[in-house]
Amino acid sequence: MSTGTADATDHRISEPPSSIKEFLSYMGPAWVFTASQIGGGEVLSVPLGGAYLGMEGIWLIPLITFTKIFGQYYLVRYGVMTGDTFLDALYEKGWWLKWIFYYVFLGGIIYAIGLSGHLGETAGALNTLVPASTEVWMLLTVLAGLAIVGLRSYGLIEKLATSLLWVFLILIAFVSLQTAGVWAPNLASGLVPSMPGRVDGLGVGGMAFILTMFGWIGAGFGPTVSYVWFAKDKVMGMFEPLDDGVEIDKYDLTDEEIDRLKGWGDIVLWQNLLSSVILAVFSFFMWTAAAATLHVRGIQPSGFTVIPEMAAIFTTQFGQWSAVLFLLTTVAALFSTLIGPLYGMSRLWEDAFALHGLFDNYNITRDTTFRLTILLFSAIPLALNLFIEAPLILFALSGALFAPAIGLMYLSVMYMSFDIDIDSLSPVRKWAVALAVFAGVVMIASGLWEARSSIETIVGLL
């Protein structure tokens, strides 16, 4: 570890993990990201694919999860290599890139609007388990989230999210494998690429369904942005000397420190690859569980009724215990989606305010700003659920306003990654660069399509 001096003979950047045990000790940011993402698009959209299409279209899961992850990899890698988050870097650029800084910053509010759907789903699942009222469960869920995130402890978030991740992975695997006799015979044909049929629960089919799935699963806006701050608070790569209070410049790096940074970049790659495997496995089990319960009975739910419909069938087919396991899985996944991005997006706002001189010019601390931000991001979805009670409209509104953001972030960070003056710190894996650019372009296209369909959904529901 760094000693806090800038002596070039004393390496200020630790060696990257060299054993599996050491690597796993730094997997925390990826665990938190994965837990946060699974409770988003995977819980809400993947079961609809299984319900409407059966095993047809399940080939999309590995395609999407193993493609989108590379754009995210370069978002995190940029910070680990430079000590600046991509948001810091965007702020220093000309307005042709700087506007993305404010787009991402305002995305915190838009993301909070979208969280209203997740909060409503969490409360609904809890109310099915222990009947009280959805309003009571929403209040309790928000209070629990505030109590945890308000401590401003990344270590606590990491431990809790990691525990929730493995709980719902084990539970959904168990639940899905109980129905393997139904879906396994059609698995091979489902893995062969084909044009999917129509999914009325999402209002799309064919290529539109593929674009929608690209937008919803694999790496959502909140978890993706938050991952950068998870890595920062884990103190990886160039974030280490900055955390130690050492003034460091990339031109002052020793050859050994550059080699270590490249090693940290590889660690970020392996983090993302492992995360994509877990996302694919979870999505696979959610899809197959829906195919084996809803599809075989011809039940075609909408986006916000799929979970209770599946729970009811599990009760009928296997008994109440299986429905309880499934609902516990859903609650764990959804709650992890609430706390992870709530922490990460609040850290983003905290750093954004710092760039604008808030803490230098006013008598307010980072801790206070962070806690005020989490209050805002919690109050928005709670108020919208309590007073509007239209989660589908709110979820669609969030998608319409912020759909292309992830693709823009991917492409902008790719440009900035090659703008690093030290060539050895620039990306060298051409195949990974190609996949990241592909993911960025597809995400913009799918985002614009999602915005169009979201607007149509809103108009239809008003």
Residue ranges and their predicted role:
Residues K21, L48-Y73, D88-E92, W96-I100, ...:
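Extracellular loop-to-transmembrane helix junctions
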Residues S163, R347, N361-L372, A396-E450:
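C-terminal membrane-solvent junction of multi-pass transporters and transport-like membrane proteins
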Residues P17-I20, G54, V80-I109, T128-T134, ...:
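Transmembrane-helix boundary/entry motifs in multi-pass membrane transporters
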Residues W166-L202, I210-M213, I217-W229, Y410-I422, ...:
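Hydrophobic alpha-helical segments and their helix-loop junctions in multi-pass secondary transporters
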Residues W99-V130, L334-F353, I444:
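Hydrophobic transmembrane alpha-helices that form the core helical bundles
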Residues M1-E42, M236-D244, D249-K250, E256-L269, ...:
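Membrane-interface "cap" regions at the ends of multi-pass membrane proteins
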Residues T5-R12, V46-L48, Y73-W96, G124-L126, ...:
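Flexible loop linkers connecting adjacent transmembrane helices
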Residues T134-L140, W321, F353-L386, A436:
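Loop-to-transmembrane helix boundary motifs in multi-pass membrane proteins
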